Amino acid sequence: QAESSAASDVYKRQFMSSGQICMALKRLYVHRSRYDEVVEGLSAVCNRMVVGDGLLPETNMGPVNNAKQLKTVTDMIGQARASGAEVRECGQVSDEALYRRGYFQKPALVFNPDQSLDIVAEEQFGPALPIMPFDTEDEAIRRANDSRYGLCSSVWTEDRDRALSISRQLEAGYTYLNNHGPTAQDFRGPFGGFKDSGFGRNLGYEGVVQFQGYHS
């Protein structure tokens, strides 16, 4: 079945709070043998979502925070579309007039964009997700690490040993297994990023040490 609990989980990890979470799922690399299945499953989940006033009970996804950030997201989507990548804007709009007037963007899936495009290379911080196929684990790891950012990563597989092997090669401060984001956080572990995602840690023993002063 194309639409699975995994597709629902991936949706939540990227589109929670309209994608406006620092540790949200940024890019999705899928083995080519499962690519079509994941694309269709995730599309089915996204198409059920209702975008609109976040105070209404029928709404699944609210607006982007401000006009500037909305433009950042829509510019990324537009650049990807202009480059020839397929873009699928999913979901339903509860109030068309409000949607046009507000800072709304339906959940957008961008299929196999070039690695150099902003939707892949930069942080979108909004409701858009690039999905790229890969053929080998080495390729997936290389492409995942091909970024100036390195806050969070995740590995999704039923093979725990393979997941651990891959996770040790990812250049990120935190790696989740079959999960992603704040709802999967273990507060006993230090949290922070590599590269341009910052320095230092909070949470865990190491996080406490960051706030200590030393007197010799």
Where are these predicted regions, by residue range?
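ALDH superfamily catalytic-core signature
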Residues: 5-114, 177
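Conserved C-terminal structural/oligomerization subdomain of aldehyde/semialdehyde dehydrogenase
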Residues: 50, 100, 104-216
